[in-house]
Amino acid sequence: MRAGGALFVGRTNTPEFGLGGHTYNPVYGATRNAFDPARSAGGSSGGAGVAVALRMLPVADGSDMMGSLRTPAAFNNVYGLRTSIGCVPHGPTEEVFFQQFSVAGPMARNIPDLAMLLSVQAGFDARLPLTHRHAEGGDFLKQPLARDFRGMRIGWLGDLGGHLPTEPGVLETCTQALRHFEAVGCTVDAVLPPFDLEQMWRAWIDLRSFAVAGANAGLYRDAATRGLLKPEAVWEIERGLQLSAMQVYDAARTRSAWYQVLRGLFARYDFLLMPAAQVFPFDVALDWPHEVGGRAMDTYHRWMQAVVPATMAGLPALAAPAGFGAGGLPAGLQIIGPAQADMAVLQLGHAYDQASGHARVRSPLLG
């Protein structure tokens, strides 16, 4: 990014270890939403989302494991792209083969700016052998964003047949946004993946806990630092340390089976859509939503389950502004593409942006 001419003006706030979809920590406190300071900015790139939405920055970079780019984008009415596995070098870390959940990506108020930042992020890095040589950054500027989408088929996943609880108004706001895809020539059909979605969730939390424990077990094992860890970090690490090798392998098999199911859907559909967040921005004083749509959340991150399908399959997913609920709070929509179709996702996002105009709604804090 520096080689591409980026000017870094500062660091933005994140939660401890990037865990959780609400940006707060004991050092800087909570980051407040760009459209309502009494509400959460999302997380973990909550500071970045607010900075972009409030015109402090044209673009910001971040990473996304469980919606860390997508949730703040949805909460602050901007765009955030979770890139395909290997598109953008992320790290390096001491383990470069096994962990393929967290990826780096851009955030911006429009798709041309998003593509410009991605053009200097993407490419091969010899320190990370699973990055792509064919994704050299210039490709995202050489190809035009404008594209004819007439005849394209889109699958609308919605709330996955009722599996995902949603706050009243979220699903309705996202459903209303579908007309903008139809306006650019796409056909949109409701579809439900033939998969045990609870099994996918269980596999996800095992693989996530395994990865979190692998990266942070040293802090847990050290008595001097264990007491400083927030409860969610302790929970993740303890779960990860208790997993057997076969449990991790079985979870990886479930992940692979889920990818194949989505690959089958992409034989019928060019893109998939679903909400980027199951709730509107919530009270900034909360640690996380403990109930959504009348259902109790059994983990600190269950309310973010909508971002898991794309992560589990390693697919590109763009969080796009979907409009505003009755209370004036933003909602977000995910545009999910096939493996390595990052450019196609940006092109559809650009067409949607031009048709909808949602991202051009400014925060009332800007006057």
What feature does the model see in each segment?
Residues 263-264, 297-321:
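Small-aliphatic-rich amphipathic alpha-helix that forms the alpha element of a beta-alpha
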Residues 2, 139-140, 166-193, 216-224, ...:
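Acyltransferase
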Residues 82-172, 176, 350, 355-367:
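A short helix-breaking turn/cap at a secondary-structure junction
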Residues 12-20, 195-197, 276-278:
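Short, solvent-exposed turn/loop segments enriched in Gly/Ser/Thr/Pro and often Arg
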Residues 102-109, 237-243, 335-336:
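Short, well-ordered beta-strand elements within core beta-sheets of diverse protein domains
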Residues 131-134, 202, 250, 282-304:
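Short, surface-exposed loop/helix-turn segments at secondary-structure junctions
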Residues 143-158, 206-263, 275-280, 284, ...:
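Short helix-loop capping/hinge segments that flank enzyme active sites or metal/cofactor-binding pockets
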Residues 2-124, 311-332:
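Short glycine/serine-rich loop segments
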